[in-house]
From Swiss-Prot:
Record-linked HAMAP family: Ribosomal_uL4_B
A single GO cellular-component term on record: ribosome
Originating organism: Deinococcus geothermalis (strain DSM 11300 / CIP 105573 / AG-3a)
NCBIfam families membership: rplD_bact
GO molecular function: rRNA binding; structural constituent of ribosome
Region of interest (Disordered), ranges: 41-75
GO biological process: translation
Function as written in the Swiss-Prot or TrEMBL entry: One of the primary rRNA binding proteins, this protein initially binds near the 5'-end of the 23S rRNA. It is important during the early stages of 50S assembly. It makes multiple contacts with different domains of the 23S rRNA in the assembled 50S subunit and ribosome. Forms part of the polypeptide exit tunnel.
Gene giving rise to this polypeptide: rplD
Assembly mode: Part of the 50S ribosomal subunit.
Family assignment from sequence similarity: Belongs to the universal ribosomal protein uL4 family.
Residues in the signal sequence: none
Name recorded for this polypeptide: Large ribosomal subunit protein uL4
Length: 213
């Protein structure tokens, strides 16, 4: 059972979380699944049927002394079609829900074991970048590490979004990949209450989201 101290306006308490042992293989599975879902999959090449070439035979089959050829759209000629080239497709695949939940719990456990997880109940910010920087310094965040801020508080999100070393996500956007690519995790205490039910889910485009069920 991991005990996480809560700071902030309503801090002074702790949250007990039943976090699993970290298994790098599970984390790798979840991150690979997340990144596969983000791939655009728009690479496309033309086959010999799609290139702009005449379908007429280049020259007679016999009598010229040249090698036998049909039309110029074959892959052996410059400007011809591509054999077995890429076509638009989806790289996403399914990953069991329990594995996704376990991966997120392990990512939280990893940051907790390293002492890089901070729970906050009440940031008390006014939406100004200056107030966030001041709050960060008071709590040991000096910009030397990349920080992931997870909160639904609009004023906090507004205050932190222009800070170069901070990334802001809503609670619903909590995911394994973003946790692992930031050195520190600052999370709203509310998001940790149902931590055993958190789940990383795929998202479209370049944003990956999670869901607390």
């Amino acid at each position: 059972m991991a005990q996480i101290n809560v700071i902030g306006q309503n801090g002074g308490r702790s949250i007990d979380l039943d976090l699993p042992e970290v298994n790098p293989h599970v984390l790798h599975e979840v991150v690979t699944w997340q990144l596969a879902g983000r791939r655009r999959g728009t690479a496309s090449t033309k086959t010999r049927a799609e290139v702009s070439r005449s379908g007429k035979k280049m020259y007679s089959q016999k009598g010229t002394g040249n090698a036998r050829h049909g039309d110029r759209s074959v892959p052996t000629f410059v400007g011809g079609g591509v054999a077995f080239g890429p076509k638009p497709r989806s790289y996403s695949y399914t990953l069991p829900r329990k594995v996704r939940q376990l991966g997120l719990a392990m990512a939280l456990a990893d940051r907790q074991q390293q002492g890089k997880l901070t729970a906050v109940d009440g940031f008390g910010l006014d939406g100004k970048t200056k107030s966030f920087v001041s709050w960060a310094k008071e709590n040991g965040l000096d910009g030397s590490e990349r920080v992931l801020i997870v909160t639904d508080d609009e004023l906090t999100r507004r205050a932190a979004r222009n800070v170069a070393w901070a990334t802001v996500l809503p609670v619903a956007g909590l995911n394994v990949y973003d946790i692992l690519r930031h050195e520190r995790l600052v999370i709203d205490a509310v998001a940790l209450e149902p931590a055993q039910e958190l789940e990383t889910v795929p998202a479209e485009g370049n944003v990956q989201e999670g869901a607390a069920l």
